[in-house]
């Protein structure tokens, strides 16, 4: 009798995290990183959303397909405007708990010294 082996492969929509960051106003490069964890681990990234601390959408930004958002270069005296919530949207083709293929996670950026 030949033994039978079963291989199971589970799929899971990603859970997404974005770390909070504090930057000094004179830092020229300001980046945020989207970290999805799911199976399969091949992700599509969508536009980032920048929201005020009150949840109002300020702008949408392209972050590329590596999950890293580099904030646009602006004059030092205007960098305080980069403070707020940043929402990453990504997916791996698997439908999540609430029926969505795209999942979101967010973190906050604070710009000090202006």
Regions found by a protein language model. Give the residues of each.
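Solvent-exposed loop/turn motifs of extracellular immunoglobulin-like beta-sandwich domains
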Residues: 1, 25-29, 41-43, 74-89
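Surface-exposed, flexible coil segments in extracellular/virion-facing regions
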Residues: 49-74
């Amino acid at each position: 009798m030949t033994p039978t082996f079963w291989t199971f492969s589970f799929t899971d929509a990603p859970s997404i995290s974005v770390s909070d960051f504090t930057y000094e106003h004179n830092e020229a490069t300001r980046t945020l990183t989207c970290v999805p964890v799911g199976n399969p681990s091949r992700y599509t990234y969508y536009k980032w959303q920048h929201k005020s601390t009150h949840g109002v959408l300020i702008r949408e930004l392209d972050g590329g397909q590596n999950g890293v958002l580099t904030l646009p270069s602006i004059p030092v005296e205007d960098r305080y405007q980069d403070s707020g919530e940043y929402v990453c949207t990504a997916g791996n083709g698997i439908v999540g708990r609430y029926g969505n293929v795209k999942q979101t996670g967010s973190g906050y950026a604070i710009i000090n010294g202006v």
